[in-house]
């Protein structure tokens, strides 16, 4: 299979990442980052998500337009655009507080029609659309970011739907990462990617297992590096590139992302409504509000 310029829809979460010690906000979020990086890597990318009509939402929309991403699937809803405030403790990034705002949405009929016309659709754990993944996979190749979730039940239910299943495995040694990738493959994923930060990555497919080291870089901020790696891998697979070439290009792209603040740039002065902010623990403990 070779698709020179694949069409990819990224569905789900977005956020403005607000750096407390810089008074700057950057557009981000797993699905939104994926759309931008896929577009940069030569795909035709569309982002389907939701923002509010506030400063953060307008900045997200403008940033996507500036990157050439199709925003016809970006909804504007009453409420607040999602944000996360990021601090710095002894050189380590710390997530201080956040608000999911209107960012968690369910797919509508028009979203599914658009997905059916695409080559692939990307989403992930942070988008909270697991109940709709079968609908996605029925219409296009599904790329799903499990992040750090590795429960048997989740892998067994989602991996069979996946063209590309991706995991963040910075805490895994090489053998554990390889075992996880093979478990996802055995559960039904066609391709499985494990990113391990500075320890490199492994891509397991129908006929090959390919490992690659991380590319050297001066790390400023790792936010968005995993999304970069996944997007470059998906684009490469759809183009029919060799796994080794895909991983080398993805590692180089992720290294570049680590060299600056924010997922893909576009800083603006922080302007958010913190009246509904919660701690990160509270965010994870509370069921998300899903907007129709």
Annotate each PLM feature:
Residues 8, 45, 71, 141-142, ...:
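Hydrophobic anchor at the start of a short beta-strand
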């Amino acid at each position: 299979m070779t698709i020179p310029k694949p069409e990819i829809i990224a569905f789900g979460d977005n956020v403005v990442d607000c750096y407390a010690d810089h008074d700057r906000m950057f557009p981000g979020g797993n699905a939104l980052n994926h759309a931008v990086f896929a577009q940069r890597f030569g795909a035709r990318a569309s982002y389907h998500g939701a923002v509010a009509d506030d400063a953060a939402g307008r900045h997200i929309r403008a940033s996507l337009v500036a990157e050439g991403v199709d925003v016809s699937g970006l909804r504007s809803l009453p409420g607040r655009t999602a944000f996360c405030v990021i601090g710095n403790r002894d050189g380590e990034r710390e997530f201080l507080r956040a608000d999911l705002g209107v960012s968690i949405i369910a797919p509508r009929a028009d979203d599914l029609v658009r997905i059916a016309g695409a080559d692939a659709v990307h989403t992930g754990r942070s988008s909270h659309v697991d109940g709709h993944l079968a609908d996605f996979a029925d219409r296009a190749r599904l790329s799903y970011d499990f992040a750090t979730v590795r429960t048997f039940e989740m892998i067994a239910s989602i991996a069979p739907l996946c063209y590309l299943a991706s995991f963040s495995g910075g805490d895994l040694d090489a053998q554990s990462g390889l075992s996880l990738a093979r478990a996802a493959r055995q559960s039904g994923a066609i391709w499985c990617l494990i990113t391990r930060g500075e320890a490199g990555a492994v891509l397991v497919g129908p006929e090959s297992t390919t490992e690659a080291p991380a590319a050297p870089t001066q790390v400023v901020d790792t936010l968005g590096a995993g999304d970069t790696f996944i997007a470059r891998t998906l684009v490469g697979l759809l183009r029919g590139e060799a796994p080794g070439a895909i991983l080398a290009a993805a590692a180089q792209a992720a290294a570049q992302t680590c060299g600056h603040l924010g997922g893909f740039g576009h800083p603006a002065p922080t302007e958010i409504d913190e009246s509904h902010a919660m701690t990160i623990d509270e965010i994870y403990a509370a069921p998300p509000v899903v907007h129709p």
